[in-house]
């Protein structure tokens, strides 16, 4: 792919957008920058990084009318809007940073492990990266997990990697056509981002774009959407919490197995919850697909401590355990967190619902939750969706109030779980900030 003298508009000026500007300018493109809202201080900051960079703001259509060949989109901007559709119909090309990286790794023949799914993808990406590093591979961990892929490539100064471990969101996959992972997984599909997609099937089809090429597919046998993603003629590794598969959990003994062979007992896995047993199986399958030793992988699984804000115990007071799952930003994540915990629960839900249907939480909560505490802008919708199933629900003005009220009702042996099933931006700067407030409220008890 050549960009010499191509006129390219980079839309969205966060970390991904900045990395695309740097990469494209280095490769000879004539680059301009666009954001719907641009504050003078941001223009000044970016302008110091890139001499002579032209900025556009306001309507995207007005910017695109300036004769651009390519529109490079940051993940937060959907290409499903009339201005972009018209740009494509007039011969313009739309791509993102993953498509740019695909061109690089394809030319170098770097191995790629690609990971997506509604829930668990950050944990699995981190675990796969950790296992690859522990097994001695020169490993790059990038993508939706935090470091933009082109920033990671820039830092390596063009040096070939043994393996790229990429966390990819559905947004990043929308305009990715050339990535051919050595091994890839869709961990699961549940309602998320339905404010951006037509329906759940549309969302699942976007996720399935991760399986372009002929690499190994690692698929969740318990998920109907994932089962439908199997491609003819491809090597597939199935994992399951429900029945025998290539990788599966024997519930009676708590053993993870590969076929008939014992792999590891769940007690030896630091990650809590049944959903993390599935994450471990997916990670081991992905790593085996690039030739890593199963024996070494299982030893290193025992030392992986997981990530903050994902079903993480933050403390205990008078026998009541407090668990932070602030990263549980959709219904599927919260249902998985609840299913993976055995003790009686008081669950804090709420925030920005992103168009989700919360009724699937009814089955997850009934019989396990002694109380539900609702916060945030979509608390009324959650109450409506859960109404009538016998749950004791309490509306709280703040997260701190929810923590205090839950603790007042809890007994020794109970768990207070923050797993909101919602985004956080109505009340917090992000899920990490929401977690900080939760921890502060716990410490104040």
Swiss-Prot record:
Give the subcellular location.
Cytoplasm
- Please name the pathway: Cell wall biogenesis; peptidoglycan biosynthesis
| Subcellular location, principal | cytoplasm
Which positions bind ATP? 117-123
Gene Ontology MF: a single term: ATP binding
- Which reaction does this enzyme catalyse, per its entry? UDP-N-acetyl-alpha-D-muramoyl-L-alanine + D-glutamate + ATP = UDP-N-acetyl-alpha-D-muramoyl-L-alanyl-D-glutamate + ADP + phosphate + H(+)
What the record says about family reads:
Belongs to the MurCDEF family.
Report the protein name in the record. UDP-N-acetylmuramoylalanine--D-glutamate ligase
Q: Which organism is it from?
A: Neisseria meningitidis serogroup B (strain ATCC BAA-335 / MC58)
């Amino acid at each position: 792919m050549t960009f010499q003298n191509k006129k390219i508009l980079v839309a969205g000026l966060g970390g991904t957008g900045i990395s695309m500007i740097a990469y494209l300018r280095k490769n000879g493109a004539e680059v301009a920058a666009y954001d719907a809202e641009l504050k003078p201080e941001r223009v000044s900051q970016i302008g110091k990084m890139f001499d002579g960079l032209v900025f556009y703001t306001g309507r995207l259509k007005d910017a695109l009318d300036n004769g651009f060949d390519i529109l490079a989109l940051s993940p937060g901007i959907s290409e499903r809007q009339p201005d972009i559709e018209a740009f494509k119909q007039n011969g313009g090309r739309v791509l993102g940073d993953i498509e740019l990286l695909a061109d690089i790794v394809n030319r170098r023949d770097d191995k790629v492990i690609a990971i997506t799914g509604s829930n668990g993808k950050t944990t699995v990406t981190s675990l796969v990266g950790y296992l690859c590093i522990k097994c001695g591979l020169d490993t790059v961990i990038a993508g939706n997990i935090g470091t933009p892929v082109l920033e990671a490539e820039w830092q390596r100064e063009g040096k070939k990697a043994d393996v790229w471990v990429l966390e990819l969101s559905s947004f990043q996959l929308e305009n990715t056509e050339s990535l051919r992972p050595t091994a890839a997984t869709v961990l699961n599909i549940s309602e998320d981002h339905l404010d951006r997609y037509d329906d759940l099937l549309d969302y699942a089809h976007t996720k399935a774009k991760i399986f372009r090429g002929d690499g190994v597919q690692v698929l969740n046998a318990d998920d109907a959407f994932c089962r439908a993603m199997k491609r003819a003629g491809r090597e597939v590794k199935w994992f399951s919490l429900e029945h025998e598969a290539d990788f599966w959990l024997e519930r009676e003994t708590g053993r993870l197995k590969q076929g008939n062979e014992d792999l590891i007992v769940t007690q030896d896995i630091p990650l809590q919850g049944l959903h993390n047993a599935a994450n471990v199986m997916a990670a081991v399958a992905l790593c085996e697909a690039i030739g890593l030793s199963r024996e070494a992988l299982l030893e290193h699984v025992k030392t992986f401590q997981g990530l903050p804000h994902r079903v993480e115990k933050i403390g205990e007071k008078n026998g009541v355990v407090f668990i932070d799952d602030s990263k549980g930003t959709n219904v599927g994540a919260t249902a998985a967190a609840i299913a993976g915990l055995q003790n009686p629960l008081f669950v804090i839900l709420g925030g920005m619902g992103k168009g989700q249907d919360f009724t699937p939480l009814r089955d997850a909560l009934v019989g396990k939750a002694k109380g539900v505490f609702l916060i945030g802008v979509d608390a009324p919708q959650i109450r409506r969706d859960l109404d009538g199933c016998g749950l004791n629900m309490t509306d709280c003005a703040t997260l701190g109030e929810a923590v205090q009220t839950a603790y007042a009702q809890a007994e020794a042996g109970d768990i207070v779980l923050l797993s909101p099933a919602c985004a956080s931006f109505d009340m917090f700067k992000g899920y990490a900030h929401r977690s900080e407030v939760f921890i502060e409220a716990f410490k104040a008890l």
